[in-house]
């Protein structure tokens, strides 16, 4: 056990120690919840524009269910139950961990709520759309978000791994609930699978928009961070 803890400590400090001004802004932005508001609006537009309203509403409902379950599990159950300090608050790490722009997060970090939420949403949406381009893209973006939690110093690796497991379970559960509800209430009025509704140029355009958004954050990370820090007091 001591060996495992030492390995995790060294690996965490190595991953956390890869600091660069450009990456500071990028990982700070990609980790912030409010940064994704514009893409959330774009996602709603993608779901509803020239698509069956009921089909889109079922997907929105499933996404909200996923977020609700993940938030409750991570914030209301795991964090207060295990009460494990984040690296940025842990007495054994606080002098060694590198934070970004002074952000340290809440007191407890087990499990990672960001990881749980993003993994669940990635699994659910990749199963909904069944598009390889989108699947590779969304999982790549999720990997960046997960690493950002280590980079900015607010999660241990052992906060991340259980978060991945819980996210996969929740994502699978929500997908099954969605399929059941969809077949029961939409029935013969809808295609056999929602991927038929969102196939073709529609899903490709949404995926390219997602890639473009992440690339824009990387290219303009320092400028965007300065603007957001000036106008928004709380990004997370």
Curated annotation (Swiss-Prot):
<feature type="transmembrane region" description="Helical; Name=2">
    <location>
        <begin position="58"/>
        <end position="78"/>
    </location>
</feature>
<keyword id="KW-0441">Lipid A biosynthesis</keyword>
<keyword id="KW-0812">Transmembrane</keyword>
<dbReference type="GO" id="GO:0009103">
    <property type="term" value="P:lipopolysaccharide biosynthetic process"/>
</dbReference>
<feature type="transmembrane region" description="Helical; Name=4">
    <location>
        <begin position="160"/>
        <end position="182"/>
    </location>
</feature>
<keyword id="KW-0444">Lipid biosynthesis</keyword>
<keyword id="KW-0472">Membrane</keyword>
<dbReference type="GO" id="GO:0046677">
    <property type="term" value="P:response to antibiotic"/>
</dbReference>
<feature type="transmembrane region" description="Helical; Name=1">
    <location>
        <begin position="26"/>
        <end position="46"/>
    </location>
</feature>
<keyword id="KW-0046">Antibiotic resistance</keyword>
<comment type="function">
    <text>Removes the 4'-phosphate group from lipid A species. Absence of phosphate groups in lipid A renders the bacteria resistant to host-derived cationic antimicrobial peptides (CAMP) and allows it to camouflage itself from the host innate immune response. Removal of the 4'-phosphate may be required to generate the substrate for deacylation of the pentaacyl lipid A to the tetraccylated lipid A species.</text>
</comment>
<keyword id="KW-0443">Lipid metabolism</keyword>
<keyword id="KW-1133">Transmembrane helix</keyword>
<keyword id="KW-0997">Cell inner membrane</keyword>
<protein>
    <recommendedName>
        <fullName>Lipid A 4'-phosphatase</fullName>
        <ecNumber>3.1.-.-</ecNumber>
    </recommendedName>
</protein>
<feature type="transmembrane region" description="Helical; Name=3">
    <location>
        <begin position="134"/>
        <end position="153"/>
    </location>
</feature>
<dbReference type="GO" id="GO:0030682">
    <property type="term" value="P:symbiont-mediated perturbation of host defenses"/>
</dbReference>
<comment type="similarity">
    <text>Belongs to the lipid A LpxF 4'-phosphatase family.</text>
</comment>
<feature type="transmembrane region" description="Helical; Name=5">
    <location>
        <begin position="200"/>
        <end position="220"/>
    </location>
</feature>
<dbReference type="GO" id="GO:0005886">
    <property type="term" value="C:plasma membrane"/>
</dbReference>
<dbReference type="GO" id="GO:0016791">
    <property type="term" value="F:phosphatase activity"/>
</dbReference>
<dbReference type="Pfam" id="PF01569">
    <property type="entry name" value="PAP2"/>
</dbReference>
<dbReference type="InterPro" id="IPR000326">
    <property type="entry name" value="P_Acid_Pase_2/haloperoxidase"/>
</dbReference>
<comment type="pathway">
    <text>Bacterial outer membrane biogenesis; LPS lipid A biosynthesis.</text>
</comment>
<keyword id="KW-1003">Cell membrane</keyword>
<dbReference type="GO" id="GO:0009245">
    <property type="term" value="P:lipid A biosynthetic process"/>
</dbReference>
<keyword id="KW-0378">Hydrolase</keyword>
<keyword id="KW-0448">Lipopolysaccharide biosynthesis</keyword>
<dbReference type="InterPro" id="IPR036938">
    <property type="entry name" value="P_Acid_Pase_2/haloperoxi_sf"/>
</dbReference>
<keyword id="KW-0843">Virulence</keyword>
